[in-house]
Each structure stands twice: as C-alpha cells, then as structure tokens.
C-alpha cells in the first residue's frame, strides 16, 4: 500500500503513520533509503546535461541557402555586400568611406535591383537620397542636444505597380560606424539582410499588397540623427504604419526581438506566428526599457517622433567585439545571417498581407502580450489579461494547498515560520558571503577577473554562496524537530515563488511568466506521486521517490534557468567593459551570482532534510573553491584582459591627441597645452593602464575652480557621468596637433533686456564632429536657444549644457546660433563688465587622413605589439587594449 505525503485523506493517514514523527523522520534520513552522495551526483549531472543542451540549441544555426534561387533569403548573397562594406574599414558619418564609397556601393546594388523590378513588371520601385538637417534633444546617459547638417539617408520603396498603397512597412538599418571599427554586425549585416530581402521581393512575380520602405541610414552612431531626419522630414513618412529596426551589439549569434510596440499588438503577434527561428522575450524588453543597458537604437526615434509601433531586433552575442576593430565579417558564424534573413523576410511578407496594416495605429495601447521563446524551438505567447489570470490562479492554488495542509494538521503555521527562518538565514549567509568575496576581489586587485572568461562568475560567486546556503540548511537539518520537515521546506519554496509572482503581477510586470513557469509543475509534485502510486509504479513514498519526482518537476525550471543564465552572462559580462567608471561591476556580477545561487538553494533546500549528512559534500565543494582561488591569484586566469586572434577580450580606451587653448573674459590667452586625453571605458579606469613613457607624469585633469561639468576636456560625446574627468588622464606631450581646420569662435552680438541676456555666436572651422559646452556664469540660467525649443523642466536644469554638432555629405560654411540667459537675481549685471557665459568648443578628427597624429600612430603600434606578447614582462597583460583614437582641438572662451 502507498505511503505518501498530502493528497486524498485515506492515503495521507497512512503517510502520517509512517513519516510524521520527527524521530522517525530522522531515522529515515540516516537510513539506507535516504538521499546520498550519488543522488547529488545525479542531480548535478542532470543540471549539466540540461545546461549543455540549452547552450547547444542556443548556438544552433540553420543551413546557408544557395544564392541562385530568389524565392528565399540567401546568406551567400548577403555576405557579398557585407564583405565589400567592411573592407572599407570604419565608416563614420561625414567620412569619405561612408559618404562616397559605401554610398556608391548601396546605390549600385539598388540600381541593379531596379532593373530586376522593371524586367519582372509586377511591382514598382522608387529610390531617393535624403540629406536632412535639424536638431533635437535627447536624454540618454545624460541630457544633451544633437544638431546635424546634410547627413545621408538612402531610401527605397517597393510596392504594387498601380501606385502607393498608402500603407507602408519601414525596415531600418544604418551603414555608418563608430570610429576605428569596420562595423560588420553594427550594423552592416543588417543592411545586407535588408538588401537581400529587397532583392527577393523584387524578383517576386506576385504583386505586393502594400509598400515596403527600406531606410539605409548614414548617421545612427551620431546618436540616432539620420532616423530623426527621416521620420520628421521625408515625404514617405506619412504612409508608414509599422517598422522593423535591425541592430547589433555584438557579433553574430541569434538575433533577439527585445522591444515591441508600443501598442499594435498585432505586430508582435505577426512575428510570433511567422518567424521560423524565434528568439524573443518580454523579460528582455523590460530590462532594456528600464535603462540599465548603456545603449539605444533608432526604435526610440520612430516611436517618440513618428509615433509608430515597431519591432526592435538585434544581434547580441560576443559583445566584446561591439564598437571595436574586431567587429569583422568573418567573425559572424555561418547561418547567423541566414536565420535573421529568413525571420525578417517571413515577418515582412506576413505584415504586408495583414489587414491590420491599414487600420489606424492604437499607439497609446499598453503592452498586451506576454511572450517568450523556449530555447529557440517555439514561442509561447498569451495576452497580459490571460497572464494575470494564470498568475493569480497559480498563487491562490498554492495558498489553498498550504491552508489545506495546515487544516489537516500535516504541519502548523509555526512550522512554516521556522522553515522561512531557515530560508532567511541561508539567504543572509549568502549575501554576507557575496560581500566578503567582493571585498576580497577588490583587495586583491581582481576586479573584472571574469571579463575574459564568464565561467569564472560561477566559481567565484555562485560556488561559495552555494556552500554558504548548504551549510545553513545542513545545520538546521541536523538539528531538526519539525515533523514532515521536507514537506514544510518544499511548501515554503512554493509559497516564496507564489508571493513573488503575486507581487510582480500586481505591479504589471509581464516578466512574471518566468516565476509562473517555476511554479506550475512543482505545485503538482504530490499529485504526481499519488498518480505513481495509483498505477502501481511505487509502493510507498521514500526520500528517493521524493528526490526523483522533484527532479522531474523541476526539469522545466532548470531549462528556463539555464536559458536565462546563459543569455544573461553572455550579454552582461561584455557590457561591463563599457559601463564606465562610476559603478563597480562586482556589485552587478555579485548580485547576479546571488540570484543564481539563492535560486538553486531555494529549489533544492528541502532535499537537505532527507539526505545523509552533507559534511563530505560541503568539504569537497570548499576544497574545489579553495583550489580555484589559488589558481585565480597565482596564474594568468585572474587577468581580466587577454588577446587572441579568435577571441580577443580587451580593455577599451579612447585616446585623443588634443590641443587646448583657454581665453579669459578680456580675450587674453591664459593657457595653451598639448596632451593625450585618455579614458578607459571600464571600472578599472585609466589609472590601471600599463606603465610607459607615454603615461609618465600623467594624472587626472585638474578641475579645481572649473565650472564646466566636462572640466574643459574634449569629450567626444556627453558621457562624463559614466566616465568622469577625474577618472581620465591628461598626459602632456611635446608635439602640438596639426589642425587642418582650426576652430574660430566669435561673439557676434550681446544684448541685455532686463533680467535676460541674448548672445549670438559664430563658429567657423572644425571638422564633422563638434561638441559645444554651454556653461552659464554669475547666477545666469539657460532660458532658451536657437538649437531647439528646449523644455528645461523636461530636459533637466544643468550646470553645463552639451550640444553635439555634426555634418555628413557637406560641411556648413559657418555655424551661427544664439543663447538667451535669465538672471536669477531679477536684474542682469552689465554684460560688458561681468562674465556671463563660458563656451567650450571641441572638434574631433575621427576618420580619414587627419585622424591620427604621429603620437597616436606610435601608441597604436605599441598596443598592437604588446598585447600579443603579455608573457614578456610582469603586468604586460595590461596591454590587452583596443583603442579608439583621433586628433582633437578644444577652445574655451568666457564672454
């Protein structure tokens, strides 16, 4: 006859007679049927097999299709243009590589496709070159203003031959890059995918139901300027009803749908139903939209300025290569382009046929879908309302189960309280362990030791926290006096998940699906045991039956956990290399390890109470951890950076060879110097750079008495909050920078009007990237200016306002602007006698023949040589560097 825990009353009574007494429970625990070492080996092997299977599926790519058939997308065809674009090298907006060479390649391909459309005779194709100018305000990393002049957009529209349908789908990519990167994944590959999709549609012998607009934009890396120019100024913008934005923040791998909306849930549903290789998660959307990721895409521009709903899709694997010299075509593995192209083509075809494309956009509609893929095999999606219902049902079913057991005297509320105390103490022990590990890492100068090898996070943080949690629960198990202790501990697991699920649902977090998946099957553990007994599979409930049933119930949990962990570690570890100097990344990776470790302990803690003593296993784990620490501090395993041809894991730096001139209120030159302005993009900072004559006598800039938030430094963009001036280096060098276009800043007029002061300025010279620091002085505040209709309340009042000015195809002869200041005291002092405003104008030569000086060329050569031979001297691993560089000038004047 079956002995079991919980369930129908007649079986529960038999279970109680055999198992309810604490002394019987303790004897069972120490007996031959209790869980032993080999069962924990089974458990670890199961988790390892699940993780390996998940990773294998995560890396699986479809076969590359032959390029001779135009019925389907072909990576083989797409790579031809990709190789051509990346062979040009870096392509910043305004460079010859972009404005002439890459532009010519794209135009040439469009011309050939136009001939195909004319030959087939079913559809029509139009193309246009747009060169917009404009300004807008942006809150990203900081608050700043962007102005652009004649940047380049190449726009193509294909649709039914009878004429524009009035309803268009927009596909967007950008073919410009950051300086010093060939930009294969960011974002040339997206443009080649779009080009092949266009070619497939061009060969179609079936008339398209609606139009598709392809935007090849040439100034995304200037903070989304080209998308802004298109959606605000191009005549085709009025017919666009939805968009797909293609991006890249890594190199290859599977592209993920990480943003959808706002509103227009049919658009998301179309992707979920039609993409043959889905990879998506509402959890990724909520993380990205929270702002913790230092990145942004054109999705924001189309959403905020065009009020259009869309899909944001990006490559994220190998983020170490993002915005570096290593973002190369050959690093994108075969099949990665094929799967993205097949997904995009299938979704485009489905959207064009959708009747919803013709309906007015429900833009203000909230997200209505919970969606995620299951290891890339299929997608699960349901409405938010259905999700809330499922979540609350799962919560109340759990609460009902616990109440039922309390009423049937299987355990008491006091027993639950004691079990929760076990969880709290275990969690506190893990938190303390995490903090001790972080302190050890900082003290031993091991910060970011996991950067080149993400697996170290598991050994450094997860393992010791697992040991801490196991010690606590093992101690309580050895001193247990609760009857049915395993049941009590297990039910507190369910209560914990149910409570978390309830709170996430209450606060409208769609990512609550993840907790729901961890709760559904474990709730049915006892029912499964009852069914096994009913069909004669088991005769009685033993610790081993409980173990294997729980292992089965938690298999989906392990799959989802392994999937989430592999994605989070793969994504977040490389991001730490560009997160800046303000946040110690150990306080990000440590809590990430805590989530993994505490989740694992929570899943299995009840098994400690039906196991033999855990002392041997704990000692073994501690010995493994001690051996790991020894290896970490005595070998190169603990070095955060390492160069290899296949997998470079390098420190990012920006090095600008700059001339700086400073003038006082009277117009007298007070300071003129030449230096390397260097900042490291990760937390180890510029002070961690290797010792060399280039850096001898260097120190952080002296910002004493400087009002400018940017410390009168030639920042490329407004990133001083992530990379503060005091964390950078100002390295004096003897050689001045030869400047082909020196900056000439002049005051044109100055008019006082009561408490207001209007100043008009002109800037001549400078290159295609220019930064303006506007710092009001002597109780003045910025009221307005000619760049934008700035809303100070929305924008945020600042000590220094930053304007990033660029040009693309053509340079402006002069930049003329006015600034209106308001005095806080109500009466403006005599502007002729008092300082009113400080302007700093910096320009950057980030491409072409003017980019490098001899000093920068020597620095590049030294980095390239020494990062390949770190074994030649102690500490040479610090030469594991990848560099963005250029010449620069900054002129500071007080008016």
Curated annotation (Swiss-Prot):
Keywords of the record: Endoplasmic reticulum, Glycoprotein, Hydrolase, Membrane, Metal-binding, Metalloprotease, Protease, Transmembrane, Transmembrane helix, Zinc
Cytoplasmic compartment residues: 1-34, 405-423, 474-492, 539-544, 608-613
Active site residues of this protein: 220
Named cofactor requirement(s): Zn(2+)
Top-level class of the enzyme under EC nomenclature: hydrolase
Cofactor binding annotation: Binds 2 Zn(2+) ions per subunit.
Taxonomic superkingdom: Eukaryota
GO CC terms in record: endoplasmic reticulum membrane
Residues bearing glycans: 659, 702, 758
Sites annotated Transition state stabilizer: 322
Binding-site residues, Zn(2+) 2: 186, 221, 323
GO biological process: proteolysis
Record-linked PANTHER family: ENDOPLASMIC RETICULUM METALLOPEPTIDASE 1, METALLOPEPTIDASE M28 FAMILY MEMBER
Sequence similarity: Belongs to the peptidase M28 family.
Protein name in the entry: Putative endoplasmic reticulum metallopeptidase 1-A
Species classification: Eukaryota, Metazoa, Ecdysozoa, Nematoda, Chromadorea
């Amino acid at each position: 006859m079956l002995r079991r825990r919980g369930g129908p009353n007649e079986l529960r009574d038999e279970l109680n007679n055999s198992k309810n007494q604490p002394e019987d429970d303790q004897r069972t625990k120490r007996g031959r049927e209790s869980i032993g070492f080999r069962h924990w080996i089974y458990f670890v092997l199961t988790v390892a097999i699940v993780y390996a299977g998940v990773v294998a599926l995560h890396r699986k790519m479809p076969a590359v299709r032959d390029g001779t058939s135009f019925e389907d997308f072909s990576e083989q065809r797409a790579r031809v243009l990709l190789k051509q674009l990346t062979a040009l090298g870096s392509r910043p907006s305004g460079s010859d590589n972009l404005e002439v060479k890459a532009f010519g390649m794209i135009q040439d391909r469009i011309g050939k496709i136009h001939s195909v459309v004319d030959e087939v005779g079913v559809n029509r194709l139009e193309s246009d070159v747009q060169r917009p100018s404009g300004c807008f305000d942006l809150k990203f990393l900081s608050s700043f203003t962007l102005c652009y002049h004649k940047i380049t957009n190449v726009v193509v529209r294909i649709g039914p031959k009878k004429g524009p349908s009035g309803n268009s789908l927009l596909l967007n990519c950008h073919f410009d890059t950051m300086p010093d990167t060939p930009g294969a994944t960011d974002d040339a590959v997206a443009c080649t995918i779009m080009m092949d999709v266009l070619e497939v549609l061009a060969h179609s012998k079936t008339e398209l139901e609606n139009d598709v607009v392809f935007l090849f934009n040439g100034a995304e890396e200037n903070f989304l300027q080209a998308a802004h120019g298109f959606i605000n100024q191009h005549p085709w913008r009025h017919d666009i009803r939805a968009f797909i934005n293609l991006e890249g923040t890594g190199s290859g791998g599977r592209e993920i749908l990480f943003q959808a909306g706002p509103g227009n849930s049919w658009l998301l549903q179309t992707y979920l139903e039609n993409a043959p290789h889905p990879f998506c998660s509402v959890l990724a959307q909520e993380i990205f939209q929270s702002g913790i990721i230092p990145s942004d895409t054109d999705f924001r521009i189309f959403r905020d300025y065009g009020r259009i709903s869309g899909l944001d899709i990006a490559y994220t694997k190998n983020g170490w290569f993002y915005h570096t010299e290593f973002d190369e075509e050959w690093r994108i593995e075969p099949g990665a382009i094929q799967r993205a192209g097949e997904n995009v083509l299938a979704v485009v075809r489905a959207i064009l046929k959708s009747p919803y494309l013709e309906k007015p956009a429900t833009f203000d509609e909230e997200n209505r879908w919970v969606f995620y893929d299951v290891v890339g095999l299929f997608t699960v999606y349901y409405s938010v309302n259905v999700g809330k219902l499922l979540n609350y049902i799962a919560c109340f079913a759990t609460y009902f189960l616990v109440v039922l057991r309390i009423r049937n005297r299987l355990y008491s509320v006091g027993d639950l309280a004691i079990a929760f105390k076990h969880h709290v103490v275990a969690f506190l022990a893990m938190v303390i362990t995490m903090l001790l590990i972080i302190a050890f890492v900082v003290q031993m100068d091991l910060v970011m030791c996991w950067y080149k090898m993400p697996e170290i996070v598991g050994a450094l943080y997860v393992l010791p926290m697992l040991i801490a949690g196991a010690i606590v629960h093992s101690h309580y198990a050895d001193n247990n006096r609760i009857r049915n202790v395993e049941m009590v501990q297990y039910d507190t697991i369910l209560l914990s998940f149910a409570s978390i699920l309830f709170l996430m649902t209450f606060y409208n977090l769609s990512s609550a699906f993840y907790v729901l998946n961890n709760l559904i099957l474990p709730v049915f553990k006892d029912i499964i045991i009852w069914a096994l007994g009913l069909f004669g599979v088991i005769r009685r409930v033993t610790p081993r039956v409980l173990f294997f049933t729980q292992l089965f119930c938690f298999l989906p949990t392990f799959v989802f956990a392994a999937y989430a962990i592999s994605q989070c570690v793969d994504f977040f570890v490389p991001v730490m290399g560009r997160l800046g100097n303000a946040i110690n990344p150990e306080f990000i990776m440590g809590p990430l390890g805590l989530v993994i470790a505490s989740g694992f302990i929570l899943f299995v803690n009840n098994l400690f109470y039906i196991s033999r003593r855990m002392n041997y296993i704990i000692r073994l784990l501690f010995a493994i951890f001690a051996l790991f620490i020894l290896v970490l501090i005595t070998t190169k395993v603990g070095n955060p950076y390492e160069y290899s041809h296949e997998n470079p894991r390098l420190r990012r730096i920006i090095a600008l060879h700059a001339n700086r001139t400073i003038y006082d209120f009277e117009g007298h030159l007070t300071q003129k110097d030449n230096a390397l302005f260097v900042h490291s993009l990760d937390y180890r900072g510029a002070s961690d750079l290797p010792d060399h004559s280039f850096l001898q006598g260097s120190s952080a800039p002296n910002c004493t008495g400087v009002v400018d938030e940017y410390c009168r430094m030639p920042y490329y963009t407004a990133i001083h909050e992530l990379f503060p001036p005091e964390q950078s280096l100002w390295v004096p060098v003897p050689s001045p920078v030869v400047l082909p276009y020196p900056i000439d800043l002049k005051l044109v007029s100055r008019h006082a009007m009561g408490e207001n002061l209007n100043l008009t300025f002109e800037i001549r010279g400078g290159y295609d990237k220019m930064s303006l620091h506007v710092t009001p002085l002597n109780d003045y505040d910025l009221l307005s200016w000619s760049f934008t209709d700035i809303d100070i309340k929305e924008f945020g009042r600042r000590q220094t306002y930053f304007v990033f000015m660029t040009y693309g195809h053509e340079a402006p002869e002069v930049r003329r602007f006015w600034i209106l200041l308001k005095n806080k005291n109500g009466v403006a002092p005599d502007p002729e006698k008092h300082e009113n405003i400080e302007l700093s104008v910096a320009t950057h030569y980030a491409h072409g023949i003017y980019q490098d000086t001899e000093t920068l060329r020597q620095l590049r050569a030294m980095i390239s040589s020494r990062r390949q031979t770190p074994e030649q001297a102690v500490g040479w691993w610090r030469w594991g560097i990848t560099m963005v560089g250029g010449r620069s000038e900054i002129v500071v004047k007080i008016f």
